Amino acid sequence: MTHPNLLVELFVEELPPKALQKLGDAFAGVLLAQLQAQGLASAASRVTAYASPRRLAAHVTEVAPQAADKAVSQKLMPVTVGLDASGNATPALLKKLAALGADASAVPGLRRAPDGKAEALFLDSTVRGATLSEGLQKALQESVAKLPIPKVMRYQLSSGCEQPGWTSVSFVRPAHGLVALHGTEVLLSVSVLGLTAGNATHGHRFEAAVDPVVIRSADTYAQQLAEEGAVIAAFADRRAEIARQLQAAAEQVGGGVRPIQDDALLDEVTALVERPNVLVCEFEKQFLDVPQECLILTMKANQKYFPLLDAEGRLTHRFLVVSNIRPDDASAVVGGNERVVRPRLADAKFFFDQDRKKTLESRVASLAKVVYHNQLGTQGERVERVRAIARAIAQQIGDVELARQADQAAQLAKADLVTDMVGEFPELQGTMGRYYAQADGLPAEVADAIEDHYKPRFAGDTLPRGDVGVVVALADKLETLVGMFGIGNLPTGDRDPFALRRHALGVIRMLVEKELPLDLETLLHSALPAFGDKIQDPTASLADFIYDRLAGSLREQGYSAQEVDAVLALRPQRLALVGKQLAAVRAFAALPEAPALAAANKRVTNILKKAGDVDAHVNPDLLREQAEKDLYAALQRFVPEADALFAAGDYTGSLQTLAVLRAPVDAFFDDVMVNAEELDLRLNRQGLLQSLHVAMNRVADLSRLAVA
């Protein structure tokens, strides 16, 4: 049987734009879940969320007018407790029935059924299914209560409020209307936030053809709002329309220009308008002398405009505005937006011109007045630490010129923090440093490194372009990690105010993707001297932290937990080689010999752990059993070949060479007693196993591949 569809709308004052989409999805999602839980909507029911600046709504398909009655079986008590020897109800049973709204007349109808080892009494009854009005009342209250509201407003209801007992309400914004339609039927008994449901809503604040818009049925809601109310109610439809208009406007301008791609800005603008209208505006070309990042940021962040870029990605003097009105003559709207943006761009030009009057080097001294952390000193002290770490890293790489340029870039990397432009737009730190370094005539490698030393800023971000940038970026992140761990300022749960997890992943990415010939623990220790006595040595805990981040990253890349565990158990120092080690482990695990060798390796590990400190020396004269002689001979024959492949970086070949050891290893454990009574035999056999263990576990701890 087909049931009518349901439409519910809350009409409110302008909702916070950055939360709108989440609010709309949550409102619709909870509403559907609650209706399904009460049996009013089925698993086949579908919900469509509507969210605009002044409304949250949901359209649910196939909603029953009343839920089906439910058979309920209530366990009462054991028969021996509820009935006496004559079969009459005991006072305990009568009391229980009374609590459930029944009396002694229900006793003959009680059902007996096994309950564990005893027999119990059950009261079978039928519970009437909730009507849609009853169920929607509960669902609506739950939907409102569970909205992810960023900040709650408390407001007084009007004196004409129809809901008795309601005087004030807490909600994200004041609500002024409630629509609840089941097909064409208005669910008049439903209420929320002091509002009683009806079928009238409001369209666009200025351009609605009629007001109020009387919704005829649940299925005509979106169409009527569009035709009579001049509102595109669905967030996704409105977003798509804005994107279409942006592209069309860019094509109208011509010359291959395109609007800047920014999903967050598009989402925010979608949440600001109900009837989008994209207009082309422009500003004076003289402002293009200012770095385009400054102009783009001020237009996006302050005005919600879409700058137009040419085919090479350069900013043009035109931009697109998403208006909420469609006047016959748009010139006033265009002119108003052009007037508004001009002072913003003039401010950016003023900051840029003023900042260039001083060199970056002359600003470094001012960093001594900027506090970085009360336990780690000023930004000036931090700069000196980053310089020292950068020099140490460059020396490990062995490039004198790299060390000189890295030192210069590290000295100037934070200088733009005390410029007017970065003071106004903190997001431009590093970027403005590059521009000012170029204006000061510094080498391109140094200028690029100043911008790139913050990279990667987020997951998926690019890495520094050149070697100088990589060295300074590594030094900057190591300074933060070592410093914060050294004072015990560690991330906890969701709290990571200094982005230490991101910094650790940045270090990992640079070491791996740039294939740097640097050892992790050497890097960590090289950062310590720069701090003097300000911190405790955190290298052990910091190394654990970095390996944990590496493990998580590798699992996200598709490696199994066993593979990752096997490689990282060895605490590899050259992270750039971890990928080759994992590939070798995966190839080894696919061999038919792998399970037996992994299990044997686990057994060897346990034996050696119990034996304590075991020397890998083997005396051939003490080999008595044929199986141990065969294993020794196999090690002598194949381990040198495997070692040579390992030294050449062929980890896969190294492990595959050792696969031939399966047969002699199996025979050894079948025929040889390792813990012989004679001490010299026992030590010799343990030494043989130690030799096997060393040979097998150079690439990874293969015992971690054994099935538990």
From Swiss-Prot:
HAMAP family tied to this protein: Gly_tRNA_synth_beta
Any GO BP: glycyl-tRNA aminoacylation
Spans through the membrane: none
Source superkingdom: Bacteria
Name used for this protein in its record: Glycine--tRNA ligase beta subunit
Organism for this UniProt entry: Paracidovorax citrulli (strain AAC00-1)
Keyword vocabulary terms for this entry: Aminoacyl-tRNA synthetase, ATP-binding, Cytoplasm, Ligase, Nucleotide-binding, Protein biosynthesis
Keyword Protein biosynthesis belongs to the record: yes
InterPro entries: DALR_anticod-bd (IPR008909), Gly-tRNA-synth_bsu (IPR015944), Gly-tRNA-synth_heterodimer (IPR006194)
Family according to the record: Belongs to the class-II aminoacyl-tRNA synthetase family.
Localisation: Cytoplasm
Catalytic activity as recorded in UniProt: tRNA(Gly) + glycine + ATP = glycyl-tRNA(Gly) + AMP + diphosphate
Subunit structure: Tetramer of two alpha and two beta subunits.
